Amino acid sequence: MSCVPWKGDKVKSESLELPQAAPPQIYHEKQRRELCALHALNNVFQDSNAFTRETLQEIFQRLSPNTMVTPHKKSMLGNGNYDVNVIMAALQTKGYEAVWWDKRRDVGAIALTNVMGFIMNLPSSLCWGPLKLPLKRQHWICVREVGGAYYNLDSKLKMPEWIGGKSELRKFLKHHLRGKNCELLLVVPEEVEAHQSWRADV
């Protein structure tokens, strides 16, 4: 089973109305080259200056010094399509940890109030200009709470996608985790990870 676009609960979503208050200011960094890991990190922190391509490249080189043997390989390997090790190391520089979620478990066991945000890795369609190719590639996205509601801040979206409250978020996560090659990371402060207080079942 592959990941399919999130449609939500159609019956409920049609009857739901957004809060009448002014919408929150949401930082949504959009896709540029193959920098989805960078965009996901900056969207989690809601800060365009949280990380740069250069800082992630430095972390990548520190973790894999032998991959940068010659200058011509640097541009090939440093294309911004970073793996989970770079994301985890980047979060640690800010005092945060990435907790891998075992998708066999119920997402109801996540203590949402102790989680700053979520980074998901899932298959995404490749595009060539306006054309969508019949190919998929793994892609990093951010989901987090802003102003009392959860949003999908996928850098490929034109604008933030409103998910809703905690129950809608859990449905969103369950929907994607049922798919093939979909993984979930919880972004939590170091002390939360140390005490495992991201778990609601302890």
Curated annotation (Swiss-Prot):
Enzyme category, top tier: hydrolase
GO cellular component: cytoplasm; plasma membrane
Catalytic residues of the enzyme: C36, H139
Superkingdom per UniProt: Eukaryota
One Gene Ontology molecular-function label: cysteine-type deubiquitinase activity
Post-translational modification Phosphoserine, affected residues: S15
The EC number(s) this enzyme carries: 3.4.19.12
Alphabetical UniProt keywords: Cell membrane, Cytoplasm, Hydrolase, Membrane, Phosphoprotein, Protease, Ubl conjugation, Ubl conjugation pathway
GO BP, one annotated term: proteolysis
The reaction(s) this protein catalyses: Thiol-dependent hydrolysis of ester, thioester, amide, peptide and isopeptide bonds formed by the C-terminal Gly of ubiquitin (a 76-residue protein attached to proteins as an intracellular targeting signal)
Membrane-crossing segments per the record: none
InterPro entries named among the record's database cross-references: JOSD1/2, Josephin
The record's account of how the chain is modified after translation: Monoubiquitinated. Ubiquitination activates deubiquitination activity in vitro.
Domain Josephin: 23-202
Cell compartment(s), UniProt: Cell membrane; Cytoplasm
Keyword Cytoplasm: yes
Main function: Deubiquitinates monoubiquitinated probes (in vitro). When ubiquitinated, cleaves 'Lys-63'-linked and 'Lys-48'-linked poly-ubiquitin chains (in vitro), hence may act as a deubiquitinating enzyme. May increase macropinocytosis and suppress clathrin- and caveolae-mediated endocytosis. May enhance membrane dynamics and cell motility independently of its catalytic activity.
Quaternary state and interactors: Interacts with beta-actin/ACTB.
The name this protein goes by in its record: Josephin-1
Species annotation: Bos taurus
